[in-house]
């Protein structure tokens, strides 16, 4: 056994041993309970970050713990390998994205292996492999055949820098999620998936408690994104005719509202820039035409429109109020989306905050029609009660006056239905998923374009449509347009004439919508999913239905995008008879972000320059609060001592120079320290604030563990010296008489084991580590018994240390593996890989004696030890005979016993 804890040597040896044993290859086993635990697959950006380390260590701890408890556990890994970053790196470095991606995968895989993760690498996949994306294409064709996939022209979000379409979810405050460029609106053809057909079911599963293992926060985010609204769709009649003489829209401008009770407060209508009425008015209005062009920049999402300045322009057109026949002016508003509802909204300035601001800006009448008792309406400023539908009562609304919200909505709906101008309707915020991307590095959409037959699906026998690997994008659009090899020899499947391939590729969220199923049978070239998927993804107690994977782990940032698409994809596969589950993930854990200090200073260009924490010294006030920082060495043009700004804690990122390189951490302290620190510092769901001093503390703890094992080894106290049961509890034909210290040690160890086991089941891994630390403290503090019972001491120590090693093994597997073997536990009960989880010994928890506080006249004067089952009379006798009682020099008048707590002698 090594005299010194050397993590690099220990970890290398342990990993070599696991590799030689092929320790983590998993197959189906009908004799064991199965458990499928999976982390969200990473994008191969080049290097792991500490968020990866935390995510995968959580998964690894769960996997190892369950394996020790007799489960057949699958922990796979793959690569979300398509996407824009690879293209941009190719532009920067002048190399094909395929090469850049493969090199990154190779390096990041080495990093994962250095962490000692229990990954079954035989199931590794990369979404850029033709053998994987063939099935993207195959399922796309099935969706096309079933009408789930379709092609249409629509106004989309266009990123002018990346020159691609963005899904609504990829637009943040009117800017592209990756480039930050102001998003434009364009009309282009593309393929869409009817996720809206599944809206009701997608909503039901997150609102009807059918996903009890999901965080409530995530379910609420999905509920809000799906956005079911029940309201009224009705029309404002008009007589505006187009160039052909026909009434535009049949002479009706339709809107949808959930606030029909405010219909008498409508003072204008607004339409989207793409609305037919706007287009008609712009033909004779150059200013309006210019405004419509201006509206084409900016996002097409509700979030984007909510943050941008609200602008509008009169069209000169009018519609008629359906109840009062009052003429209402039509405006073009940059905040109205053509893709939502009918591309028009009714303007009720008095009771809608957006309309209120718009009316103030353009001098439009504000007409109050709802009153809340005790409130005063001020036409100059918005107050939250203006939109209160719970307390409000209608006023200034003719026959509808005096009605509460629901009553007024029903009454208005009835009248408009009678007039043939309205109907009750349910609408959804969710929109069909646009999957076409005008980029190269993605799954080719399996469509051929023929001059005669249009868009024709590629025959299944010709799949996969393979993406050329030799393209080097130059940033000026999709290189597939001009790639001769991609189009060479392509003919129409219908007529056989020369044709061209579709050059759009699929949104990369398609790749990640089902990869977890492919892990179950990754090498199958005959089917998308097969028997292995049924084994790993389904509860064997359920014939059909239910949820799939047992545990999914990933960041909260994927709550809407990835998770919603994966749920949709699973339901489509179910309806096509490919899987038997309703949902992809039974339980979901969203781990917290890893945070670090952020230091910056504004540069001469007006931007901010960020500094690495190791180059900075913090400045504190008298209370110890960080109030600033200064450089401890020259950085670029900034000399040592320069004052810089402290921005607080924030997510680790390359752009802010506050990341920690896992490889450097492993090189200095070892993988076990990195794993231990990320688990101990905070609960898995909470943010982890990085602290270099705490890393040192984690490393010191592991040195203590090693040194204690070294002491046992030197004293000859190895597991081979005692007969151990498989669970780690002592088991001999004639159990030795444990001395009091040994009994106390065993009681404390088994109490801690009970708590640690409970925390493992709850996945509260920070308290698992703290429990293990308490175990080590108990072992280190153990004092030998009297000579007559010293024979039992080695057994208590070796049992206790064996329990500690097994409690530590899921979080720090390398050091536990090494000590387990060096101290003979492997020879006694088998290799730690498959050693059983230690069981709590109920006998060890039984206390022979208990300690009671001793009071004299209500004041604490010490304690006494009494038999655990002592009667009150026996306790009184022991208390009266205690040194403190005898020192009083008198006979107590009364003895008060509080069972299990204290004895009070009253003199």
Swiss-Prot record:
Gene Ontology cellular component annotations, sorted alphabetically: cytosol
Top-level taxon of origin: Bacteria
Coiled coil location: none
Alphabetical UniProt keywords: Aminoacyl-tRNA synthetase, ATP-binding, Cytoplasm, Ligase, Nucleotide-binding, Protein biosynthesis
Protein name: Leucine--tRNA ligase
Listed NCBIfam families: leuS_bact
Extent of motif 'HIGH' region: 42-52
Pfam families given in the database record: Anticodon_1, tRNA-synt_1_2, tRNA-synt_1g
Location of the motif 'KMSKS' region: 651-655
Residues holding ATP: 654
Catalytic activity: tRNA(Leu) + L-leucine + ATP = L-leucyl-tRNA(Leu) + AMP + diphosphate
InterPro entries: aa-tRNA-synth_I_CS, Leu-tRNA-ligase, Leu_tRNA-synth_edit, M/V/L/I-tRNA-synth_anticd-bd, Methionyl/Leucyl_tRNA_Synth, Rossmann-like_a/b/a_fold, tRNAsynth_Ia_anticodon-bd, Val/Leu/Ile-tRNA-synth_edit
Listed EC numbers: 6.1.1.4
Annotated GO MF terms: aminoacyl-tRNA deacylase activity; ATP binding; leucine-tRNA ligase activity
Cross-referenced HAMAP family: Leu_tRNA_synth_B
GO-annotated biological processes: leucyl-tRNA aminoacylation
Localization of this protein: Cytoplasm
Enzyme class, spelled out: ligase
The keyword Hydrolase is annotated on this UniProt entry: no
Family: Belongs to the class-I aminoacyl-tRNA synthetase family.
Keyword Lyase: no
């Amino acid at each position: 056994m090594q005299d010194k804890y050397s993590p690099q040597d220990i970890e290398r040896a342990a990993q070599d041993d696991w590799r030689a044993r092929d320790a983590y290859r998993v197959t189906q086993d009908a004799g064991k309970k199965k458990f499928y635990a999976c982390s969200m697959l990473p994008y191969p950006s080049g290097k792991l970050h500490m968020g990866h380390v935390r995510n995968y260590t959580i998964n690894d701890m769960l996997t190892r713990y369950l394996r020790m408890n007799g489960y057949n556990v699958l922990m796979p890994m793959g690569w979300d390998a398509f996407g824009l970053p690879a293209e941009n790196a190719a532009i920067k470095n002048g190399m094909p994205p395929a090469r850049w991606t493969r090199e990154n995968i190779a390096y990041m895989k080495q990093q994962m292996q250095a962490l000692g993760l229990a990954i079954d690498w035989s199931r590794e996949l990369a979404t850029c492999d033709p053998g994987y994306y063939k099935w993207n294409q195959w399922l796309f064709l099935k969706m096309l055949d079933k009408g789930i996939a379709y092609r249409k022209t629509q106004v989309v979000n266009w990123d002018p820098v990346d020159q691609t379409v963005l899904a609504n979810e990829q637009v943040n405050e009117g800017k592209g999620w990756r480039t930050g460029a102001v998003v434009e609106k364009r009309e282009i053809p593309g393929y869409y998936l009817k996720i809206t057909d599944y809206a009701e079911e997608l909503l039901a599963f997150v609102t009807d408690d059918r996903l009890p293992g999901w965080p409530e926060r995530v379910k609420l985010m999905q509920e809000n994104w799906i956005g079911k609204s029940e309201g009224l769709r009705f029309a404002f009649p008009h007589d505006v005719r187009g160039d052909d003489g026909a009434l535009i829209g049949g002479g009706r401008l339709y809107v949808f509202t959930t606030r029909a009770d405010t219909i008498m407060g409508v003072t204008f209508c607004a339409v989207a820039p793409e609305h037919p009425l706007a287009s008609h008015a712009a033909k004779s209005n150059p200013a309006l035409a210019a405004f419509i062009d201006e509206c084409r920049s900016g996002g097409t999402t509700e979030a984007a429109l909510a943050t941008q300045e609200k602008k509008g322009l009169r069209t000169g057109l009018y519609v008629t109020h359906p109840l009062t026949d009052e003429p209402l002016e039509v405006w073009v508003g940059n905040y109205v989306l053509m893709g939502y509802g009918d591309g028009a909204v009714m303007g009720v300035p008095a009771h809608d905050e957006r309309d209120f601001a718009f009316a103030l800006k353009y001098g439009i009448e504000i007409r109050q029609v709802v009153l809340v008792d005790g409130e005063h309406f001020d036409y100059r400023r918005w107050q939250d009660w203006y939109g209160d539908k719970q307390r409000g009562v209608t006023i200034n609304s003719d026959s509808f006056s005096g009605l509460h919200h629901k009553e007024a909505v029903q009454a208005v709906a009835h009248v408009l239905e009678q007039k043939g101008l309205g109907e009750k309707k349910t609408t959804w915020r969710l929109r069909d998923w646009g999957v076409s991307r005008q980029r190269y590095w993605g799954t080719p959409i399996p469509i051929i374009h023929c001059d005669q037959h249009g868009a024709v699906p590629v025959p299944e026998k010709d799949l996969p449509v393979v993406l050329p690997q030799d393209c080097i994008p130059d940033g000026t659009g999709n290189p597939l347009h001009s790639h001769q090899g991609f189009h060479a020899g392509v003919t129409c499947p219908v007529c056989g004439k020369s044709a061209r391939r579709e050059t759009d590729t699929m949104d990369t969220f398609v790749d990640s919508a089902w990869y977890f199923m492919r892990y179950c049978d990754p090498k199958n070239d005959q089917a998308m999913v097969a028997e292995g998927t049924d084994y790993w993804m389904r509860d064997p107690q359920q014939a059909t239905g239910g949820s799939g994977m047992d545990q999914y782990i990933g960041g909260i940032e994927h709550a809407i995008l990835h998770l919603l698409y994966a749920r949709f994809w699973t339901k489509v596969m179910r309806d096509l008879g490919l899987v038997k589950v309703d949902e992809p993930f039974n339980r979901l854990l969203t781990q917290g972000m890893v945070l670090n200090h952020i230091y910056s200073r504004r540069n001469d260009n007006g931007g901010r320059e960020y500094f690495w924490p190791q180059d900075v010294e913090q400045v504190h006030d008298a209370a110890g609060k960080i109030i600033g920082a200064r450089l401890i060495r020259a950085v670029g043009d900034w000399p040592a001592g320069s004052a810089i700004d402290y921005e607080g804690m924030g997510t680790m990122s390359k752009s802010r120079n506050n990341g920690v390189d896992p490889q450097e951490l492993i090189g200095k302290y070892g993988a076990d320290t990195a794993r231990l620190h990320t688990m101990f510092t905070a609960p898995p769901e909470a943010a982890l604030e990085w602290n270099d001093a705490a890393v040192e503390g984690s490393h010191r703890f592991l040195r203590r563990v090693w040194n204690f094992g070294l002491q046992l080894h030197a004293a000859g106290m190895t597991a081979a010296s005692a007969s151990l049961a498989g669970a780690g509890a002592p088991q001999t034909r004639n159990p030795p008489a444990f001395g009091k210290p040994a009994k106390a040690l065993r009681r404390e160890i088994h109490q801690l084991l009970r708590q640690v086991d409970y925390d493992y089941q709850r996945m509260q891994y920070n308290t698992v580590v703290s429990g293990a630390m308490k175990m080590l403290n108990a072992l280190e503090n153990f004092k030998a018994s009297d000579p007559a019972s010293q024979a039992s001491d080695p057994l208590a120590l070796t049992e206790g240390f064996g329990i500690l090693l097994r409690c530590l093994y899921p979080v720090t597997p390398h050091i536990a593996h090494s000590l387990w073997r060096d101290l003979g536990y492997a020879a006694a009960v088998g290799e730690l890989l498959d050693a059983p989880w230690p069981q709590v010994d109920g006998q060890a928890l039984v206390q022979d004696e208990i300690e009671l506080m001793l009071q004299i006249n209500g004041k604490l004067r010490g304690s006494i030890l009494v038999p655990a089952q002592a009667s009150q009379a026996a306790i009184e006798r022991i208390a009266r005979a205690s040194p403190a009682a005898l020192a009083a020099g008198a006979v107590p008048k009364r003895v008060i016993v509080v069972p299990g707590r204290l004895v009070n002698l009253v003199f």
